[in-house]
Regions:
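Extended, low-polarity segments enriched in aliphatic/aromatic residues
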Residues: 1-134
Length: 134
């Protein structure tokens, strides 16, 4: 996925990317199922729960240039980092994505809920990070 802002989920990254595996009907349920359109807490819980069903084996996320507001469709402010992030931990990818949006990982509900489910680590200080130039 391209790391970016999302109006309801705040962040589109590894965790939300798994919504691409669902049917249109399921996607609509995620957005409307609480009875309130695009309820952030309900959507975040659905996304975290979906990742319990099938956690990604590897996420390669594009953080070269991305929208930081009014996403995902825009128009909105852009940020250029020229980075690609890869990990077997989708929570870590999205925790990093949160920092790209100048947010604390725990403030992104999908990250926090997935962390609480035991799907990965949101504390970036606990992770081994390797950087490569290409």
């Amino acid at each position: 996925p391209i790391l970016k802002h999302h109006a309801s989920a705040i962040l589109t990254g590894a965790l939300k990317n798994m919504m691409g595996l669902t049917t249109r009907k399921t996607n609509v349920t995620f957005h409307l199922g609480s009875g309130k359109r695009n309820d952030p807490e309900y959507l975040a819980q659905c996304i975290a729960d979906l990742n319990l069903v099938r956690k990604p084996d590897l996420t390669v996320a594009d953080a070269t240039e991305f929208i930081t507001g009014n996403g995902p469709a825009g128009p909105g402010p852009m940020k250029k980092l020229d980075l690609v992030v890869a990990s077997t931990d989708p929570v870590a990818v999205d925790a990093f994505g949160a920092t790209c949006l100048d947010a604390a990982p725990a403030d992104i509900l999908t990250v926090y809920m997935a962390y609480e489910h035991g799907l990965g680590e949101m504390n970036l200080e606990k992770l081994a990070v390797a950087e490569f130039e290409v």
